[in-house]
């Protein structure tokens, strides 16, 4: 089976990183204007003592989901999935794509051949997965952060990037 979702477009703002870029792509696909949605909560908030390694970390001030915190007043939310293994993780992503929803996926730049940190530096990052080809064992990936990437990754590469030794805490 081969599926590529229509209408998944890259979104990026110069003042934002991979978190906002991925969410901009996802909220636009859901029919919202990314800058209006994400700009509603454009702020700097820091929870004292809460240090994380994820580039995309955003402390949610009142326990709301990440997306609900970034997009107050909009009927959207998010949920982190922590799969038991790479296969379970891929099946979760695949199900969402089959349902018509692109997925933000946490990865390690060290394992992604299109990232400048490839095989050099471990760094948590987010990309959007919006398609797959079962026969070719590949996924369609979008990364609006320079250097821009919109293309096909072998599932083995995506699995390595999702399951690297670079641990994160969401």
Locate predicted features:
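Hydrophobic transmembrane alpha-helix bundles
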Residues: 70-83, 118-122, 142-148
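Noncatalytic regulatory segments and standalone regulatory/sensor domains
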Residues: 133-170
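Active-site-adjacent substructure of cysteine-protease-like catalytic cores
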Residues: 30-53, 85-141
